[in-house]
Amino acid sequence: MHKRCIAGILLAALLVSLCGCTSVFDKEYLSERPYEEPSNLLTDADTTQIRNYAGLMRALNTMAAQYERSFVLAFGDYDGIIADDLAAACEELRTGTAIGAYCIESVSYETEQVIAYCEASITITYNRPESEVRSIYSAQTQKSILDCVVDALDRQKTQFAIQISTSTLETDDVAALVRSACLNQPQLVVDFPSIDVTVYSGSGNSQKIFGITLQYSVSESAVNDRRTQLDGRVRTLTSALTTGEQETPLQAALVVMRACEQRISTVSTAYDALVNGSADSYGLAMAYKAVCDALNIPCQVVSGRFQGIDRCWNVVQIDGNYYHLDLSMQSETLWLRSDESMRGTYQWTADSCPTCAAQSFIWREGEKL
């Protein structure tokens, strides 16, 4: 009995102690961890941080090219007076840059100090639609300018712009390049457009944006129909020619001349020459270029003057040498001419086409080279 009483007392004491354990979880504890910088402090990885005026202008130009209407720039360890530089940079963007002259109406800003750095909220108002600004081409060389124009022709753009990092090119130079691109894309240009070029450079001249307008006389659907007809006509005309032979370029010239027997005085295209059968020197040269392209014969349309009058002709490769060939001056006999032979009556920009140094010669159908 005595042992049972002692066991009962011990059991009761144990139960009381276990009940007291619940109060342990009601106590407060201190948790420690390393200090972290607030997330709104500027870091070196933050791409919006601006440290000098040059960086500020780069950021503004980038945002304008992306058609950003409102954005925030953060100034970290800035070298200069932020308020003064912001005012100057916004004015320079609007009046002193090509992108500003092309499409920016106004630029405004507000600043706010945020802990360890300054933020500027920039607002840009544009005077052109977003689609025009975002589709500005960028070019560095004459070849890249031509590539941009060809892309615009292929897409049937009537208005487009090219940004060029140069101070030497003027509107007449760019218009000539656009014209050359049109002449040498006979499959695309089936209605020769009028060309208008406007330059935008602001008060600076390190960069220029050239706005180009092409005005056609037929609709987009008509252009597509003409391209299809011309493609079929070229395939028909070249089907009887054998590619790779020395005489093939000369035979191709006769094919073009026979397909276009009527001469007109208005500016024409390969479509006019090969589908309608009538063309001036422009149309004949473009038609020959179209046929040579189909046969993989190196050929180019040259724009120049003949006895003081605007004229187009071709420079074509025959047996490894280049020659001038003016189809508007030929009959059944072809006169392949050198640069020296042409200079007396023709004028052209020498570096616009390959050099023709080989001796001139006359070719008649059926002859072997």
Label the model's feature ranges.
Residues M1-I9:
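Bacterial N-terminal signal peptides that target proteins for export
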Residues L10-L15:
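Hydrophobic helical h-region of N-terminal Sec-dependent signal peptides
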Residues I81-A87, T97, N127-K143, L334-L369:
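Low-complexity, Gly/Ser/Thr/Pro-rich intrinsically disordered linker/tail segments
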Residues V218-L274:
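Secondary-structure boundary elements
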